[in-house]
Amino acid sequence: MIHIVLHEPEIPFNTGAIARTCVATGSALHIIKPYGFVISDKMIRRAGMDYWPKVDLHEYVDFADFLSQHPELDTGRALTGRGETHGTKPKLWYATTKAHQTYSDVTFGPDDYIMFGKESAGIPEEILTEHEENCIRIPMWGEIRSLNLSNSVAIILYEALRQNGFEALSQTGDLHRLHWRDEAALHLPKRD
């Protein structure tokens, strides 16, 4: 299971949308305090809709609390080179607009954690400089500061899931009123 970590999120609509994405992908959501809202806000529930009770939610007092509760993580302190794996330990990736490597440069493991910072400032620079080799970014045109947080989470999360074969996610869907045409006649690969 991929884990999404939000460091001090500020906007409830973003957190609600991210929570819904986590439910849709079978990913866990870890939130590091303080928040810029109350977790039971109507706005979060509205953005997360009826999925909020299904969120695999974990909360932490601060980043140190998060690290102490996850000693199994490879946080990137031991530099082994760009995009290399560190044995079998799940990695903690840090999404930032400042990183040298992109999210597509690295190999995500099936149990990795991907951390995103608050909307106004990102992940604190003290954390980024300590873990530079695990920092990743989404390429953007230079005229914009950053993408929306929930969009950034979705982009990187789905790349991590793609690299792991979309494990445990449905590969096809049913139409509401009609049926799909015969896949054999269309020369499409069979779906599971």
Locate predicted features.
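Post-transcriptional modification and biogenesis factors for structured RNAs
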Residues: 1-192
